[in-house]
């Protein structure tokens, strides 16, 4: 059907008006963001907790505080270095006091620790519930069941260094196999499906504990240290650069079930930013509490 010629000017005017409105709204948002500096957040891609917390914070900083945000995936050591040098503004992925103790010793005079965004963290060797060993000091007796290996993550990571120390301290006749966070999780999944023995370097918080029945091997010699916390660490210049962001990060701290919901959503296929947005929508009072 052909359009009535008398309707064309009206439709053209409506289209032009809507177009101008969209342009004006977009320009307004762009101007809002351009008035403020970009906040660069370093994180460790492949660490489920790092991805979850970083995306939540980024969404809040963008949507509630109006700052543009750039997420920068880095290895842990480079991440700390970047905050110290000011190449990035902050990280929400500092495991203290044990896992990242070497980085803190190196950069403590050039960074500022705002406090824990997740208390109750822990690292160590993790096994499925069905395996026989219960402790690092009896792991050697079953080493053949584990193919004489421990599946690790990125070489140089804090938990990897502690595992190398554990191998020496407990006299473990097993090799530490570096890989990555996702590769380690994939190996764990395959082993559990086949009900094979496997030991992996791991930590809480992690979605693996929600998906599988796992436990830490006891560490009677305390190589891995006691309970840890995941801290927000910033470049000292952030307070002057973005005081609202600094204030928000100083208050940000969430609970195991909260971060667990976002991590599981991502593991089940959601985009990290979308999972964080959903959590924000479901928990407006918690978000407002960090901003007030």
Stretches with model-predicted labels:
Residues 57-66, 141-176:
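Ligand-binding cleft/hinge of the Venus flytrap
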Residues 109-156:
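A conserved helix-loop-strand patch within extracytoplasmic ligand-binding domains
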Residues 1-27, 32:
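N-terminal secretory signal peptides
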Residues 36-55, 76:
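Extracytoplasmic "Venus flytrap"
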Residues 47-48, 70-82, 176-187:
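Short helix-initiation/N-cap motifs at beta->coil->alpha
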Residues 92-107, 190-215:
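A ligand-binding cleft/hinge motif common to bilobed small-molecule-binding domains
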Residues 122-132, 228-242:
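A bilobed periplasmic-binding-protein/Venus flytrap-type ligand-binding module shared by bacterial periplasmic
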Residues 52, 165-174, 178-195, 206, ...:
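An extracytoplasmic/periplasmic, membrane-proximal ligand-sensing/linker region
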């Amino acid at each position: 059907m052909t359009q009535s010629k008398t309707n064309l000017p009206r439709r053209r005017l409506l289209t032009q008006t809507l177009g101008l409105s969209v342009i004006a709204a977009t320009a307004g948002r762009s101007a809002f963001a351009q008035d403020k500096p970009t906040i660069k957040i370093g994180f460790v891609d492949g660490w489920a907790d790092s991805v979850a917390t970083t995306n939540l914070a980024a969404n809040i900083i963008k949507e509630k505080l109006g700052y543009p945000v750039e997420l920068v995936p880095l290895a842990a050591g480079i991440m700390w270095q970047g905050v110290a040098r000011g190449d990035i503004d902050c990280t929400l992925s500092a495991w203290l006091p044990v896992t990242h103790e070497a980085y803190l010793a190196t950069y403590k005079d050039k960074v500022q620790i705002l406090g824990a965004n997740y208390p109750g963290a822990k690292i160590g060797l993790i096994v499925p519930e069905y395996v026989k060993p219960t402790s690092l000091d009896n792991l050697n007796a079953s080493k053949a069941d584990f193919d004489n290996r421990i599946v690790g993550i990125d070489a140089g990571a804090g938990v990897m260094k502690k595992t190398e120390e554990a191998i020496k301290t407990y006299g473990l006749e097993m090799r530490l196999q570096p890989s990555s966070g996702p590769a380690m999780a994939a190996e764990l999944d395959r082993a559990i499906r086949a009900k094979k023995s496997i030991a992996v370097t791991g930590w809480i918080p992690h979605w693996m504990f929600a998906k599988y029945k796992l436990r830490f091997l006891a560490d009677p010699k305390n190589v891995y240290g006691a309970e840890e916390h995941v801290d927000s660490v910033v470049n000292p210049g952030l307070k002057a650069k973005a005081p609202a962001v600094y204030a928000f990060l100083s208050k940000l701290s969430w609970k195991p079930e909260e971060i667990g919901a976002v991590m599981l959503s991502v593991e089940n296929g959601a985009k990290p930013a979308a999972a964080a947005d959903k959590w924000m929508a479901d928990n407006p009072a918690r978000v407002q509490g960090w901003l007030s």
